[in-house]
């Protein structure tokens, strides 16, 4: 959800992603709206679109750009790249790019990638992810873990402060965890990301007034105790649910989010809904002040390519309509193309297994076998996406290339329908409505139209489609109001628990399909506490296969392996990663 529900889309191919218990910008583990169009892109920080075509014409340029930008087909360590380039960095200037209005700027309730992109720049937590996706110190300068693996003792950096200069203390850490766990905060992701901490679930349930697992030792020391040792716990603390807020700022004003007092590399300087969101650099940032004076996000809309070519914005993703031109070595813009890594995300159609006809696994399986993912990806999506074979995306920890998954098999699909409780009498099937993100009267995405048509032709099953605005869709999704829905999930942190446990454990708030398998639950719980990584990943491979066999999802697409963005030649230090993390402090303008 960054929804981790993570929205991958800000400028080009729109796939709405939910990450981290929510949604995020893709490419977050976050959930994303899943749409594919010529004008929208879904990918990493910039949302470039990918295309699996012969790109030999652009490869020499891409290779050169990789040295400059750290875009990761052969990037090595981006951290080393940042250090090597620091001596050339120039202070000052503004970066201008397209953006979208955030559903919220409260870190403790955010579940979408658009919100999280801004929140990541304004706030911070005890730890963060670096450009190589390692967990590294943020507000904490160091920590120790007890011998039993359950207690983490964090030592805060000296002289860290909020944007207004107020010192950050261990009491602020304690208060922030208390706030996110307060039922009145109504965080949809607190239990998902913080439920391992002793006392969080009790406070969420209203049976305790405090989170006993978070203890202030002194002004610069705080301990966090979890219920069982878990290899991924530190990674969870990089999600905005764990970000540290200023109690005075939050409690003194109902509109505190419009004047947030964070600890991040940027301050929120201006926000006009539907017009502009402007971030200004925090010169006192404890990890190093940003080079930029400000980052301006244009929220009024516009076509990215046209705005880029007229020098209204400094970077944009490349969509279907423009990709061939950009790949042409005779095109002037070819020299400004940058290759980006594939996002750690998956677009899918979810089915509520408690709602007929999806309470019958034969129907769920039949729909998975009744359309040709490869043809739709190659022809309809023009190679901009690759067919998803399962839940965990390629390149992600515990990805299983040998997963026994779905193929296009019409006869098998028809037999599965006959084997269902509905038999051959399709008139007995309940009406099926697929909910997708979109505006009233807007055209349905080409991939969904193709899939719907395939189901009608191959099986005689007719699907109605209902479009809903993203904010409403997200709330209804969390409330499990949908029989069938198309969305996406982007990684919040690099651990398979972020996909399999958060999305499929029967107790998870993000289990929008209401999937419930006691054997899967037991294996997920076993994987949580397994300390041997190889054994953990073997468990997750087994779990993923069990879920695929029962088909609560229809996996659709992963991000392509060749994604492109356009970046002005004087914009330096723009590093793209497979996940949504803070990146703007590394950027500088050199002209």
Give the location of each predicted region.
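Surface-exposed, Gly/Pro/Thr- and Asp/Glu-enriched linker/hinge segments
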Residues: 22-93, 136, 162-174, 178-226, ...
């Amino acid at each position: 959800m960054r929804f981790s529900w993570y929205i991958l889309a800000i400028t080009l191919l729109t796939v709405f992603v939910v990450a981290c218990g929510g949604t995020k910008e893709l490419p977050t583990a976050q959930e994303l709206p899943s749409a594919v169009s010529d004008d929208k892109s879904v990918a990493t920080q910039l949302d470039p679109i990918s295309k699996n075509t012969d790109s030999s014409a652009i490869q020499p340029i891409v290779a050169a750009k990789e040295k400059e930008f750290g875009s990761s087909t052969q990037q090595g360590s981006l951290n080393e790249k940042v250090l090597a380039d620091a001596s050339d960095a120039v202070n000052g200037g503004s970066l201008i790019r397209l953006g979208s209005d955030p559903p919220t700027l409260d870190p403790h309730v955010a579940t979408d990638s658009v919100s999280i992109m801004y929140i990541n720049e304004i706030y911070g937590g005890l730890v963060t992810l670096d450009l190589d996706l390692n967990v590294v110190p943020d507000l904490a300068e160091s920590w120790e873990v007890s011998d039993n693996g359950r207690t983490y003792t964090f030592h805060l950096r000296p002289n860290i402060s909020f944007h207004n200069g107020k010192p950050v203390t261990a009491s602020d850490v304690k208060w922030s965890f208390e706030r996110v766990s307060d039922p009145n905060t109504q965080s949809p992701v607190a239990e998902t990301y913080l439920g391992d901490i002793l006392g969080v679930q009790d406070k969420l349930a209203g049976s305790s007034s405090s989170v006993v697992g978070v203890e202030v030792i002194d002004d610069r020391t705080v301990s966090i105790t979890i219920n069982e040792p878990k290899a991924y716990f530190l990674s969870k603390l990089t999600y905005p649910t764990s970000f540290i807020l200023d109690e005075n700022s939050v409690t003194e004003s109902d509109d505190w989010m419009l004047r947030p007092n964070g600890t991040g590399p940027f301050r929120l300087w201006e926000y006009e809904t539907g017009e502009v969101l402007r971030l200004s650099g925090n010169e006192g940032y404890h990890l190093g002040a940003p080079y930029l004076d400000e980052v301006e996000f244009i929220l009024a809309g516009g076509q990215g390519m046209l705005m880029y070519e007229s020098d209204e914005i400094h970077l944009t993703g490349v969509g279907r309509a423009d990709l061939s031109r950009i790949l042409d070595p005779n095109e002037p813009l070819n020299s400004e193309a940058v290759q980006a890594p594939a996002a750690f995300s998956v677009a899918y159609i979810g089915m509520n297994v408690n709602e007929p006809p999806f309470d019958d696994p034969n129907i769920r399986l039949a729909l998975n076998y009744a359309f040709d993912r490869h043809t739709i990806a190659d022809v309809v999506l023009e190679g901009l996406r690759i067919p998803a074979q399962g839940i965990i995306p390629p390149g992600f920890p515990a990805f299983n290339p040998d997963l026994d998954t779905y193929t296009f098999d019409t006869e098998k699909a028809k037999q599965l329908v006959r084997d269902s409780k509905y038999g051959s009498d399709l008139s007995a099937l309940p009406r099926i409505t697929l909910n997708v993100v979109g505006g009233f009267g807007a055209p349905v995405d080409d991939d969904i139209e193709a899939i719907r048509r395939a189901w009608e032709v191959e099986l005689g099953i007719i699907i109605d489609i209902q479009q809903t605005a993203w904010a409403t869709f997200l709330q209804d999704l969390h409330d499990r109001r949908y029989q069938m829905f198309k969305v996406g999930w982007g990684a919040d942190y690099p651990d398979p628990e972020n996909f399999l446990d958060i999305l499929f454990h029967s107790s998870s708030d993000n289990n929008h399909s209401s999937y419930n398998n006691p054997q899967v639950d037991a294996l997920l719980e076993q994987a949580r506490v397994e300390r041997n990584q190889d054994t953990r990943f073997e468990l997750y491979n087994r779990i993923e296969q069990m879920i695929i066999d029962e088909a609560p999802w229809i996996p659709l697409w992963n991000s392509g392996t060749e994604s492109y963005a356009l970046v002005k030649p004087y914009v330096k230090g723009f590093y793209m990663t497979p996940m949504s993390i803070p990146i703007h402090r590394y950027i500088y303008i050199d002209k």
